[in-house]
């Protein structure tokens, strides 16, 4: 298993992501040939040193006096390139993110009429196709991105003077739920193309997940900054054969809340995306009876779940323990047939394996077994035992 973590401490652009992926081990010649066959560009790859850090630098050369393309023209170019299906889907998805962001910012609901400006040139097309091809070739099981340094100040572009991050970039970050922060450099450090590529491939994380570094890559940016203008990427190998997952733990103490309210909150949190909910009795100061509410959640869901807890319980705050690293088995739901007293029934079982396919556990789905118990008159405990017995023979 491999995990890729982008660490954009100096921002990110399309060419930086492409260069970083190449520096991590993607086939330089294969990606170069693909890019040059798919867009009217030439691609140069060279090593540079940015403030003491060696990095790969990718330069895309485009035809002079190139016209600004519309979104439909970009789509037609991508489809005409006859890319592999997975690569075409990624490329189209990334450009759709940029188109929807531009449309939202400029109040243009019809994407067919949308004109790209900075991202409508052939270099953006090359960056997206090249980055997608390189990242797919790394064959990572998961991709994460730490908070992105977006820079600060203002920029001059086709729409005039805009704040940093540019409105379209900010919209991409909002929809992609990526973490970001301002920086001390008075410059745009995150481009719309960079934001769209990262939001397509990566999930947000506040810190590096646990693992062993097996490769480190740096993609160089064009500008010279006070610090190294590079995008860092790290390939990690998890320390366990279990699958890694990034979670946050939300916790609060609640007193003067009825059991009915807590029961409703339990169901509401699960329906809103909580991975698990636990409510435990506790004793607070002065001997007051209370409950500890603990929720396991994906980082992108934490804010809405915390708000729900506060609204429903009247709690004055929720503790968030961020970026906890969870190791878990890969779990699949399989349907099997079992025979009971001459009758055949179908039921679901949960099959857990590690990353190498070793069987860790099998558990019968209670609701299915409950229905079979009612239909057959056999105790549900016996149904579950027989179901798991059959499943072990099938999946061991």
From Swiss-Prot:
It holds the Pfam family Ni_insertion. The keyword Phosphoprotein does not apply. It comes from the Archaea. Keywords: Nickel. The keyword Cell inner membrane does not apply. InterPro entries: Ni_insertion. One of its GO terms (molecular function) is lyase activity. Belongs to the LarC family. NCBIfam families: nickel pincer cofactor biosynthesis protein LarC (TIGR00299). This is Putative nickel insertion protein. It comes from Methanosarcina acetivorans (strain ATCC 35395 / DSM 2834 / JCM 12185 / C2A).
């Amino acid at each position: 298993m491999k995990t890729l973590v982008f660490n954009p401490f100096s921002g990110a652009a399309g060419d930086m992501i492409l260069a970083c992926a190449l520096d991590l081990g993607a086939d330089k010649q294969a990606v170069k040939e693909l890019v040059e066959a798919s867009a009217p560009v030439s691609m140069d790859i060279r090593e540079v040193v940015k403030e003491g850090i060696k990095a790969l630098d990718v330069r895309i050369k485009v035809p002079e006096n190139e016209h600004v393309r519309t979104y439909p023209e970009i789509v037609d170019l991508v489809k005409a390139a006859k890319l592999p299906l997975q690569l075409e889907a990624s490329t189209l998805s990334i450009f759709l993110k940029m188109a929807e962001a531009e449309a939202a910012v400029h109040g243009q609901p019809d994407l067919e009429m949308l004109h790209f400006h900075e991202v409508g040139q052939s270099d953006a097309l090359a960056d997206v196709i090249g980055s997608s091809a390189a990242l797919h070739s790394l064959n990572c099981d998961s991709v994460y991105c730490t908070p992105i340094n977006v820079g600060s100040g203002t920029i001059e572009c086709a729409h005039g003077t805009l704040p940093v991050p540019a409105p379209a970039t900010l919209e991409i970050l909002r929809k992609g739920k990526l973490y970001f922060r301002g920086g001390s450099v008075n410059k745009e450090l995150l481009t719309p193309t960079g934001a769209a590529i990262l939001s397509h491939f990566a999930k947000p994380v506040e810190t590096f997940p646990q693992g062993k570094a097996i490769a480190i890559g740096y993609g160089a940016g064009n500008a010279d900054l006070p610090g190294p203008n590079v995008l860092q990427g790290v390939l990690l190998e998890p320390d366990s054969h279990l699958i890694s997952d990034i979670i946050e733990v939300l916790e609060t103490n609640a007193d003067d809340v009825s059991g009915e309210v807590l029961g409703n909150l339990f169901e509401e949190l699960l329906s809103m995306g909580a991975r698990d909910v636990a409510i435990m009795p506790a004793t607070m100061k002065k001997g007051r009876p209370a409950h500890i509410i603990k929720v396991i959640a994906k980082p992108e869901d934490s804010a809405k779940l915390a708000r729900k807890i506060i609204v429903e319980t009247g709690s004055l705050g929720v503790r968030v323990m961020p970026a906890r690293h969870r190791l878990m088995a890969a779990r699949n739901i399989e349907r099997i047939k079992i025979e009971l007293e001459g009758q055949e029934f179908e039921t679901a079982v949960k099959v857990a394996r590690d990353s190498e396919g070793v069987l860790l556990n099998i558990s019968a789905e209670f609701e299915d077994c409950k229905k079979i118990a009612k239909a057959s008159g056999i105790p549900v405990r016996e149904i579950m035992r027989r179901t798991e017995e059959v499943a072990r023979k099938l999946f061991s």
